[in-house]
Amino acid sequence: MKKNLLMMAVLTSAAVANAQKNAASYDSTKVEKLQEIVVSGVRAQKNAPYAVTNIKKSELNEFSKTGQELPFLFAQTPGVIAWSENGLGTGTTYMRIRGAGDSRINVTLDGVPLNSPEDQCVFWANMNSYGSLLGSVQIQRGVGSSTNGDGAFGGTIALSSATPSLRPGGEVSFSYGSYNTFNFGGKFSTGLLGNHWIIDGAYHQTNTDGFIHGTSGRSGSYYGGVTWMKENFQIRYKNIGNFERTGQAWNGVTAGNGDYSLMDGSYDDGSWTYNAKTGIHGYKDMYNVGLGRYNTLYEKLATGDDGLFVKDANGNYLTERYKMADGSLWEKTTDNFWQNHNILSASWNINDYWVATASLHYTYGHGYYDEFRYNNKLYKFGMTATDDNGNNIKKSDFVRQKGLTQHTYGIVWNANYKKDNWDVIGGFSIQNFDGNHFGYVTYTANDFVRQKYLSNGDYKYYDSDAHKFDASFYLKAAYQISKQWEVFADMQYRHVGYRTDGYNDRYTEDAQKHWLDINKKYDFFNPKAGFSWHLDGHRVYGSAAMSHREPERNNFTDNGKYPAPEAERLMDYELGYTYTASKWHAGVNLYYMDYKDQFVQTGLLSDIGENLTTNIKDSYRMGIELQAGVAPLEWLSIEGNAALSKNKIKDFDEKVNVDWKDDVYETIHYDNSTLAFSPSAILNGFINFHWRGIQATWHTNFVSRQYLDNTENKDRSLPSYSVTNVKVNYTLKPKKIIRECIFGLNFNNIFNRRYASSGWVYSAILKDYGDHPNDNRYYQIGFIPMAGFTMMGNVTLRF
């Protein structure tokens, strides 16, 4: 790392004189316009009738020093929540917009889709410190304008790379904080060389011990870019690599071991009644009995000879690490993943009316989970075995590796025509995906099983290939009727073909394989229309937009007893008003999102922590989003936003497991129940202080109750929480060598709140001890918490 930073400094110094001379011959505004052309196809046009939040380069660059992943910055905008498995905001991280999870949020980088084509998620852990590479971000809530890649059912996030710098420069940064979290990185630009060339690069890495047990790890990213430009033309190649080896905790802080639940009223105290009172209702209760950092992927609750959970003298439950057969400790469950993006883009400012851009892209990804499986049934891996006496072996400890290899490649093109009252953008995106899913058993504690299946070192228990083709074409136009009025129209056609075959990682109880033979094609037409009126700082807008979305892989492979998945449709209606004055601004946005066959989270997880979903025939989300800010003094500003919503399923049939039998379910009908993971209120408040070189921000965030399934049962929910963070920066501007020196401190969760921001639930009807009514059944919750009070200090030097 020291060698890399030294090389940055040498390259920067050597290029200074020549680059400064050449930079003078270019108009920087024209260079910025060429970058704007690259993202014009996926961003809302000026005055477009959508709910939009823009994040500036300075905010992105400052946030990148925290080591946290980008969703935690996005969570400062209306209607967004974020959380991470390790409790610190680094590594494996997730987000929701308007209650819609990652797979329903379209994300692009310079117009190139970033969502993994099969599961439609973005793996933020593989985007460490990306904020330092970006020039801006635009978040569109709701359907928004047409974009490339998967359909937007919660929102669209358009990331734009920073404009190549005409002048040479460099930056190094170091951060250190709680739980031994260390973030470091640097970047450089040669400035303009030979009147046409710019070379730039960056490297960032975050190491941490993690708040949750067994979540230590490291993740990082690197970037290398070459730009060739003329006054109105630019070709740019970007190579962005990502790597991670991070400890996993997708089960969260689970209230129990396996089928034995610690939740109040669901614990078996030895009487076989499963109704003992433990006093555990939420994550705070788990923390108070010594289980606040408990991770079932790393350890298990200790039990006595009677099979009951053991406490110490202080009333805290004891845990014990997983062990291998030789007595050594299992290190931890890890996600090991490498990804490399290659983007070659060209943008051309043709004349006063026409601009165009095209990008070729290729992404390679490869990785696997390495996981200890305690006391698992053999049939889950397609195994059968007997001991020397011919007795069937039913369970053993295992280590498995579940992995995938991905190749994604395609082309993105768009052209923009502006003349008189017209602003027209047309374009297309064509993308192809090839992937392979695989799973190996690499260890078992049972000698008989090992001799039968692992004599060659490992045993492949599933293997599946996948192919996905995605092509979309769009045309969007804005017409200015008068100085105050504009109308908008947007049409998109999208074709998707998905095929997967091979055998899945699901086996019947007699160890028979689950063969996959899925071949689906979808054709979607997504029209949108709206208007905008603006005068003297006032703006009123409205729109109606349709979007469709195909099922993701898990909808086919982990569907349980629910019907075969269907594509979903959304009609999104937005109406808003904003006002901007010299010292204050305010805005309100109303929305109604009407879903047909919406994929709704069931509250269950796949066995690698993915949220499982199923189609719901009729559902809706409606709400109001408020934003306001005022600067009463030159050194003080106050801002806030609020997202208040109602998220309902009109009618819903729940499939409830009976007596833990895989093929026995009861169906329970609900009317007008609240959608899972959809809080009715998300509030953010900010107080910003800036005086000379000092900047300080107080940020308080409130999230209301979240139900973990779709039954609107308070027992199976996460209570509301409020958390406050404070950050302070001080900037020095030396006159020589170092352009800026920035010292920063981040204080997170300053009131040390104990809360979970996400989770999962399993519930069942157990007839052995009497039929539980729907509001009092057996249940177990996994809480995904954030850490209590933490802090991080950072230093940034800019040259």
Q: Model-predicted segments: where are they?
A:
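C-terminal beta-barrel architecture of Gram-negative outer-membrane proteins
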Residues: 208-209, 676-736, 751, 756-760
